[in-house]
């Protein structure tokens, strides 16, 4: 399993989420997953909403193009980003 997969123009990310971090950032690889730190707490879906907003901004897509496929209630998530307009350097390095 790879942390980042390009599939028919969409990006599939296997993520490990660190909630309540000091700032939002893509940290790097964490085993077979990409570690993402977010400032939101894991309460009442706030972390998922914040993650979607952060990823939408990072990939320059609308929030409606960011889909959490697996892991709604856990730290391990699988996320699909429909037709990303931009790919952050940390992630494009993993695609090569």
Swiss-Prot record:
Superkingdom, according to UniProt?
Bacteria
Q: Which InterPro entries match?
A: DUF167, YggU-like_sf
Identify the SUPFAM superfamilies for this entry: YggU-like (SSF69786)
Q: Name one GO cellular component term.
A: cytoplasm
Per the record, a Pfam family? DUF167
Q: Which residues cross the membrane?
A: none
Q: NCBIfam families in the record, alphabetically?
A: DUF167 family protein (TIGR00251), PRK05090.1 (NF003466)
**Similarity remark:** Belongs to the UPF0235 family.
Checking PANTHER family in the record gives: UPF0235 PROTEIN C15ORF40
* Name the UniProt record assigns to this protein: UPF0235 protein SO_3356
Species this chain originates from: Shewanella oneidensis (strain ATCC 700550 / JCM 31522 / CIP 106686 / LMG 19005 / NCIMB 14063 / MR-1)
